[in-house]
Amino acid sequence: HCSVRRQRQMCIRDSSHMGVIFVSGAMARVWLNELLANDLSILDTGHSQYTFLLNDQGGVMDDLIVYRLGDETFLLVPNASGVDLVYETMVKQLPDSDVFLENRSGSVVSLAVQGRKSLALMERMNPKVKHLQKNELFVCEGDRDSMVIARTGYTGSDGFEIFTNIEQGKQIWEWLLKDHGSIQCSACGLGARDTLRIEAGYPLYGNELDSSMTPLQAGLGFFLKPSLKNELKAMNPERLPRIVYYQLLEKTPPPRSGYEIYEGDEKIGVVTSGCLSPLTGKGVGFALVQKEITLNDIGNYKLFVRNKK
């Protein structure tokens, strides 16, 4: 965690458990724009966007990143737990022609290179990365396979994600962990991924997002195309229950999923994600609340931690 946040450090994480689905064809963009929640019509080649696959009730089947690799080629990265459902849904809705799917989950290495020094070290591997802005990408064509490098991540810090074949992925992993002088690169795992995304205020499918929760209830309406956003508002005008982000004012044991939230003596919600921020030592996370609350209110709400408010 701290390797990502500190000035002269960075980390690398193996994200190859995530799904990898390629979509191509003359009608790929049009079809994906109908299938997914964000506005794909504004996504240019060499860019990426965060989006959702929704059910008929507006609930989130999965959240994913879409990378536009070319005019007619897209890379979709769903969660590991949702890749089968996402792919099955796509197959069921696939048109008869002009759109092609390739599920390469498990055969593509995905590496997350995150932290303040990630740009400096990635430049040594490929100087082209210095031209990438946030959410931009480029494709490196190789003799046997291509590699995608994107300036994306889910940590709240600067970083990159690499998609390549297994052999090349191993070589890149080993090179990044070598001694690079003033730049320190550490390996990190899913535990650090979780505390980093919580600290940054990023939701996780299965905790803050599920098939009964709309993006509006999760506070993620800005990732919806306007027409869909209006449709979801009409379906669920009250938007309750909903997800909120919290920060504890005092140092406590770590808040955990399932801990109860109170306003006075009234239980108003439960924690969906929580941890101690390694930077502040205080509890942060998300909660599912059942009533309207005053955001940024200080001292009016209590968290029940280990039988103590």
What residues fall within each predicted segment?
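Internal amphipathic helical hairpin motif
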Residues: 26-60, 117-145
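Short, conserved phosphate/pyrophosphate- and ester-handling motifs at nucleotide-, phospho-/glycolipid
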Residues: 14, 25, 115
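Residue-level detector of beta-strand structural context in well-folded domains
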Residues: 19, 51, 64-65, 259, ...
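Short, basic and Ser/Thr-rich N-terminal targeting/leader segments
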Residues: 4, 15-17, 46-47, 59-62, ...
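Conserved, structured C-terminal
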Residues: 5-7, 69-309
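Single conserved hydrophobic/aromatic residue that forms the stacking wall/gate
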Residues: 1-8, 12
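Conserved phosphate/anionic-ligand binding catalytic regions in large, soluble enzymes, centered on
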Residues: 13-21, 153-157
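Well-ordered mid-protein domain cores that form the structural environment of catalytic cofactors
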Residues: 39-93
